[in-house]
């Protein structure tokens, strides 16, 4: 496993990745630090190599890590400190479209509870593997939708989130996040949700086809840049007192008398 992680680190370093969310790569719950990167792993309740979530962090970004929280085997949270805001990443893997609807509702309720616990000033980014085909976005790969898509939209709107992965224009090959073993079937089932307030900070989202990550998923890359609005205006633009009236000797004398009377 260590050798595979080093190969993965080399791939991610070549692509200039600093923080990466993974799924199903390590059995035990742990934080493993190496010379120039670290892996935060949520572990599993079962030993069947299903679920479990991980965050890879490059060495230069380790100093910005503020916390890693394991919710359960399907959800984990990762918090980073930035210059003006902190950023909370939520890695979630939901059931497939055919699974029990009650399990999906329970998972969404748990996700909502944890979102509500995040500081209001934080940038919230949800990395959503919900096996969802979204057919409503301007730049979605799919024309049709599935049941999971409806549940996601019902979750996004009341929680002040935006599905950015279907809003940024790209060729279809850069929207494909999953492919079948024979390469004939491709889907866009991995989505990026972000707080409405910071939706314009996502400058690019594209699925990379080249990295050798040992997965049947193409690795989506997110570029994120927050621009702060600077309040402009002349701070000296204040109403001036009518000092010209003191050029009149009469007003000048009356003003001096009133000032003396006050003391």
Protein language model features and the residues they cover:
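A shared catalytic/ligand-binding motif for oxyanion handling
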Residues: 1-263
């Amino acid at each position: 496993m260590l050798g595979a992680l080093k190969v993965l680190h080399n791939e991610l370093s070549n692509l200039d990745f600093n923080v990466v969310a993974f799924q199903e790569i390590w059995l035990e719950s742990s934080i493993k630090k190496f010379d120039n990167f670290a892996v935060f792993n949520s572990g599993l309740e079962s030993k069947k190599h299903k679920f479990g979530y991980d965050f890879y962090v490059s060495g230069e970004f380790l100093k910005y890590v503020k916390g890693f929280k394991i919710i359960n085997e399907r959800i984990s949270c990762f918090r980073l400190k930035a210059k003006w805001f902190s950023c909370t990443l939520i890695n979630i893997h939901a059931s497939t479209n055919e699974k029990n609807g009650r399990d999906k509702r329970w998972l969404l309720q748990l996700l909502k509870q944890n979102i509500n616990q995040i500081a209001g000033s934080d940038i919230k980014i949800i990395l959503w593997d919900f096996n969802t085909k979204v057919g409503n976005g301007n730049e979605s790969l799919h024309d049709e939708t599935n049941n999971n898509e409806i549940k996601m939209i019902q979750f996004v709107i009341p929680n002040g989130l935006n599905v950015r992965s279907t809003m940024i224009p790209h060729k279809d090959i850069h929207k494909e996040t999953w492919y079948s073993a024979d390469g004939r079937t491709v889907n866009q089932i991995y989505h990026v949700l972000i707080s409405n307030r910071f939706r314009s900070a996502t400058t690019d989202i594209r699925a990379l086809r080249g990295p050798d990550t040992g997965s049947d998923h193409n690795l989506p890359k997110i570029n994120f840049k927050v621009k702060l609005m600077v309040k402009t205006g002349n701070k000296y633009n204040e109403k001036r007192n009518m000092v010209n009236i003191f050029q009149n000797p009469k007003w000048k004398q009356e003003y001096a008398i009133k000032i003396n009377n006050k003391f």
